[in-house]
């Protein structure tokens, strides 16, 4: 199915709203835990430091593997030598932590004052003998999840192009890209092994030294919808072949993801239909609550289309999918599956609104009165005060939502506000009293 065909059936609109989202430097929260021998140095202002301290909620006693290089007036007015200051900090990090890699995270301020991080990093790397990766995960991006996309795209440049002689990879190998908790990554590895496909590596890997081999013989497949920059870098810089598949979110998405990979490797998938059916049967208690209910996505983290497709399959009606940014090429398989799912469930195709204007969205929510709005944190309380059930979209970013077994976690999050309000109604607490 071509993109032109999709455009005829799915309605795409673009508004001129602001990007109401977290700052992308929040990607440090999960990446420093995923890459176990790394150290993340965020180069920014006090505001960035306050944000990380509050958003990550890590006490100083925990000694996390990230820090702030705080820019002061002397830095911004070029009275201090940036190179000397960064060298001092990196030497201190090396002495205290001895990481295998230091990741410099550029912020809005470094972008505005034109700090040449890419120019300084190779010189400093040669001097201190520790790899330094530069990623500009600043707030000028569309969504906060794209911070991870920027870091992984920078990591691609550091992956080896050939395997050591003693560990030659197969002629046709598979590398998956996207940061997942170790247990979820293991589950997806096992699902592919059941189909007879061995995963050659992950980007990012748990250890910097274990970064996967990337060359023209490697097939790559993403596990998150917000990794389009990484996918482009893999294809253009390392000549990898991208497998365009739906994302493994929900039983239907996981099955389609596995089937697409199997088709590329000429492998017949084993018992996938039966396995998906068993998962759906186990979710029936949640689906009963959702069937016939409506949902409205305001747009925040680029997971909206995958989540909407899964909720349509659960029997929900999706009025609108707001999304900060849509790469139609990278998400083409997901869009096709959304269209197919709506057709099979006999429901109307949802509107997809790119860069939505929140003022217009509030009017549409007021008219449509959905049973649930999935929204950023800024809009949750005002909508609740107007009688609309809400769920924070950021929770889906930090929850384990990939693979067959984690579909229950998605439905647990989606149904929680509905179950809470039902419990309050049973108690007779369904009216707000103005004091």
Swiss-Prot record:
Pathway terms, separated by semicolons: Porphyrin-containing compound metabolism; chlorophyll biosynthesis (light-independent)
Cofactor-binding details, from the entry: Binds 1 [4Fe-4S] cluster per heterodimer. The cluster is bound at the heterodimer interface by residues from both subunits.
GO BP: any one term: photosynthesis, dark reaction
Keywords linked to the UniProt accession: 4Fe-4S, ATP-binding, Chlorophyll biosynthesis, Chloroplast, Iron, Iron-sulfur, Metal-binding, Nucleotide-binding, Oxidoreductase, Photosynthesis, Plastid
Record EC number: 1.3.7.7
Superkingdom, natural source: Eukaryota
Catalytic activity: chlorophyllide a + oxidized 2[4Fe-4S]-[ferredoxin] + 2 ADP + 2 phosphate = protochlorophyllide a + reduced 2[4Fe-4S]-[ferredoxin] + 2 ATP + 2 H2O
Ligand binding ([4Fe-4S] cluster): 23, 48, 108
Any one Gene Ontology molecular-function term assigned to this protein's record: ATP binding
Cofactor list: [4Fe-4S] cluster
Chief place where the protein resides: plastid
GO cellular component, one term: chloroplast
Compartment list: Plastid, Chloroplast
Pfam families named among the record's database cross-references: Oxidored_nitro
Known partners and oligomeric status: Protochlorophyllide reductase is composed of three subunits; ChlL, ChlN and ChlB. Forms a heterotetramer of two ChlB and two ChlN subunits.
Job description of the protein: Component of the dark-operative protochlorophyllide reductase (DPOR) that uses Mg-ATP and reduced ferredoxin to reduce ring D of protochlorophyllide (Pchlide) to form chlorophyllide a (Chlide). This reaction is light-independent. The NB-protein (ChlN-ChlB) is the catalytic component of the complex.
PANTHER family registered for this protein in UniProt: LIGHT-INDEPENDENT PROTOCHLOROPHYLLIDE REDUCTASE SUBUNIT N (PTHR39429:SF3)
Annotated family: Belongs to the BchN/ChlN family.
Protein name per the record: Light-independent protochlorophyllide reductase subunit N
Organism: Chlorella vulgaris
Recorded name of the encoding gene: chlN
């Amino acid at each position: 199915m071509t993109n032109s065909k999709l455009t005829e059936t799915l309605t795409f609109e673009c508004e001129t709203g602001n990007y109401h989202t977290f700052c992308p430097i929040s990607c440090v929260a999960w990446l420093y835990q995923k890459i176990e021998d790394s150290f993340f140095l965020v180069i920014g202002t006090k505001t960035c430091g306050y944000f990380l301290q509050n958003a990550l909620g890590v006490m100083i006693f925990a000694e996390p593997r990230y820090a702030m290089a705080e820019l002061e007036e002397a830095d911004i007015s070029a009275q201090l030598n940036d190179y000397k200051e960064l060298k001092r900090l990196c030497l201190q990090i090396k002495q205290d932590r001895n990481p295998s890699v230091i990741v410099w995270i550029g912020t809005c301020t470094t972008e505005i004052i034109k700090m040449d991080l890419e120019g300084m990093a190779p010189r400093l790397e040669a001097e201190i003998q520790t790899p330094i990766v530069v990623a500009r995960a600043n707030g000028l991006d569309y969504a906060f999840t794209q911070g991870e996309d920027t870091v992984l795209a920078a990591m691609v440049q550091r992956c080896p192009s050939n395997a050591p002689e003693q560990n030659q990879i197969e002629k046709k190998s598979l590398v998956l890209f996207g940061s997942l908790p170790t247990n979820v990554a293991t589950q997806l590895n096992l699902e592919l092994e059941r189909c007879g496909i061995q995963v050659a590596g992950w980007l990012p890997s748990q250890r910097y030294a274990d970064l996967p081999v990337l060359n023209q013989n490697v097939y790559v497949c993403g596990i998150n919808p917000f990794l389009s920059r990484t996918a482009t870098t893999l294809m253009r810089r390392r000549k990898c072949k991208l497998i365009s598949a739906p994302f493994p979110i929900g039983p239907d998405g996981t099955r389609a993801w596995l089937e697409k990979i199997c088709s590329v490797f000429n492998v017949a998938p084993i018992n996938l239909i039966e396995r998906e059916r068993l998962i759906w049967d186990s979710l029936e208690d949640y689906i009963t609550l959702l069937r016939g209910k409506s949902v409205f996505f305001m747009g925040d983290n680029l997971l909206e289309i995958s989540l909407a497709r899964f909720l349509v399959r659960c029997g929900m009606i999706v009025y609108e999918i707001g999304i900060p940014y849509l790469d139609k090429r990278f998400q083409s398989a997901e869009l096709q599956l959304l269209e197919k799912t709506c057709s099979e469930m006999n429901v109307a195709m949802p509107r997809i609104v790119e860069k939505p204007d929140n003022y217009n969205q509030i009017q549409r929510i007021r008219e449509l009165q959905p049973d649930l709005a999935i929204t950023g944190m800024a809009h949750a309380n005002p909508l609740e005060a107007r009688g609309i059930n809400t769920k924070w979209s950021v929770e889906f970013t930090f929850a384990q939502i990939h693979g067959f077994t984690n579909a229950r976690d998605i439905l647990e999050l989606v149904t929680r506000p509905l179950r809470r309000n039902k419990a309050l109604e049973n108690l007779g607490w369904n009216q707000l009293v103005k004091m």
